[in-house]
Amino acid sequence: MGFHQISVIIVVLALASARAADEFPSHTDTPTDCPEADHGCWCHGSFAQCWRTYEDSRMTEEIGNRITQLELLYQPSEEVVTYIRRISALRELRISEDGMSLDCSCDVIYALDDKQVTLVNQAELTFGNCRERGWPRERMAARPFVHRCHVLRMQDGETRKRRGADDNDGDDVSKRASPRKGDEPAGHKLKDLAPQNTHHLVNIHDADKHPASEFVNFISGHRRSRRSTDDDAAVSDDSERGARKKRYGNQGNYPQAMNPQSRGVNYGQPAQQGYGAQGMGGAFGGGQGMGGAVRGGQGMGGAVGGGQFGAFSPGEAEADNADYDEYSDSLDEGDTTISAAVMDDIKAVLGATKIDLPVDINDPYDLGLLLRHLRHHSNLLANIGDPAVREQVLSAMQEEEEEEEEDAANGVRQNVLNNINANAPGNAGYGGQGGMGAFGGGGGGMGAIGGGGGAMMGQQGMGGVPQRMGGQPQGNAYNQGYRQG
């Protein structure tokens, strides 16, 4: 080979080198597993070197699965993230700042963390345009920037956890405190509540039967069965009031239970608030002989079979006792006992509230307490997913609320009347005890001001009905618990 040929080869190589220097950023060798140089990537030592966007480089999935080390030139932050996420086998990354500065975007750091890729030139790398993204400086070195991005990510994670916990606990019934005694009930009045579509807190085990239906049937069915009779006018609601009175004694103006052996006789008690003592009932008659401070006492029972001016007539006493016995017998049958599974469902509806569970479901007072507690937490009813079941519970609670309001109003009125009677003139009263006769009823005393409503004189020994003076007995129209003439 002559000198001339050697010179031509040198010139060609020099031109090729100059062209390559203009077209490519650096020198490279070309192993078979490297991308093609004319697509914007080639191999530079052990690194694959790319200077075009991911789409323009025509990086195939097969080549991307073989590249473990990558160097990116002149790429913005968005393209750096794309390369990191698209090349599955990548383990090390070198980012060159030649001709371009990376923006202060933590997305690059988050992508490196997610793919477990190491930034090998972290010590000499810097990020720019930081003030535009809310950082205190215009440029930041890579190490402190990476550290701050890690701190921000941990803080964001904690914030998301707290927000998620707040969203999950926003309607958690276990975080609601039970209202203190005397506070207004939470939420709206029951009559203003409307069914709502909410999540179930009670699991539906059967498509045709809600697990709370047994509890609802007990509330709206058995306990209110006396309200559902054909003749409501002939049925008294006093058995339930009597059950509540039985727990607390004779308070709240509830009637006393009659003595069936004496045909509804109320035996004498010490005089209170200016009234005379109650008359002693006879063996067959019954009634109260009271000398009232303002009103006259009620007449004693007359002939055999009992008088008609007592607190209750014998027929009413028998009817009341029969209803009470029927109620007690139905409780003994065992068909109203709530099972443990249903009690668990009730607890699930109530949540971890402060009611003392388990209550005695067969005790009307305890059941009323449960209903009142549900009313104070009326928003818990929205967690009953079945609209029909929710309406039944709302109806039962509404009846309980109306009944309590009626009892409270009657108690206030009765207390007012008692105070008027106690403070009226003639407070001592002239009424004495009615006599006790074997057959005839004793006469009631005349009041100091009002006319006596009882019999002044009975037909002794004849068993006749006592004659009355001073008109009809003065009844108490406000207290429905007493059945007066």
Curated annotation (Swiss-Prot):
<feature type="region of interest" description="Disordered">
    <location>
        <begin position="157"/>
        <end position="195"/>
    </location>
</feature>
<comment type="similarity">
    <text>Belongs to the bindin family.</text>
</comment>
<feature type="compositionally biased region" description="Polar residues">
    <location>
        <begin position="476"/>
        <end position="485"/>
    </location>
</feature>
<feature type="region of interest" description="Disordered">
    <location>
        <begin position="459"/>
        <end position="485"/>
    </location>
</feature>
<dbReference type="Pfam" id="PF02084">
    <property type="entry name" value="Bindin"/>
</dbReference>
<feature type="compositionally biased region" description="Low complexity">
    <location>
        <begin position="465"/>
        <end position="475"/>
    </location>
</feature>
<feature type="compositionally biased region" description="Acidic residues">
    <location>
        <begin position="317"/>
        <end position="331"/>
    </location>
</feature>
<keyword id="KW-0732">Signal</keyword>
<comment type="function">
    <text>Species-specific sea urchin sperm protein required for adhesion of sperm to the egg surface during fertilization. Bindin coats the acrosomal process after it is externalized by the acrosome reaction. It binds to sulfated, fucose-containing polysaccharides on the vitelline layer receptor proteoglycans which cover the egg plasma membrane.</text>
</comment>
<keyword id="KW-0130">Cell adhesion</keyword>
<dbReference type="GO" id="GO:0007155">
    <property type="term" value="P:cell adhesion"/>
</dbReference>
<keyword id="KW-0968">Cytoplasmic vesicle</keyword>
<protein>
    <recommendedName>
        <fullName>Bindin</fullName>
    </recommendedName>
</protein>
<dbReference type="GO" id="GO:0043160">
    <property type="term" value="C:acrosomal lumen"/>
</dbReference>
<feature type="region of interest" description="Fucose-binding domain">
    <location>
        <begin position="371"/>
        <end position="379"/>
    </location>
</feature>
<feature type="propeptide">
    <location>
        <begin position="21"/>
        <end position="247"/>
    </location>
</feature>
<feature type="signal peptide">
    <location>
        <begin position="1"/>
        <end position="20"/>
    </location>
</feature>
<dbReference type="GO" id="GO:0007342">
    <property type="term" value="P:fusion of sperm to egg plasma membrane involved in single fertilization"/>
</dbReference>
<feature type="region of interest" description="Disordered">
    <location>
        <begin position="219"/>
        <end position="273"/>
    </location>
</feature>
<keyword id="KW-0278">Fertilization</keyword>
<keyword id="KW-0165">Cleavage on pair of basic residues</keyword>
<feature type="compositionally biased region" description="Polar residues">
    <location>
        <begin position="250"/>
        <end position="264"/>
    </location>
</feature>
<dbReference type="InterPro" id="IPR000775">
    <property type="entry name" value="Bindin"/>
</dbReference>
<feature type="compositionally biased region" description="Basic and acidic residues">
    <location>
        <begin position="172"/>
        <end position="192"/>
    </location>
</feature>
<feature type="region of interest" description="Disordered">
    <location>
        <begin position="305"/>
        <end position="331"/>
    </location>
</feature>
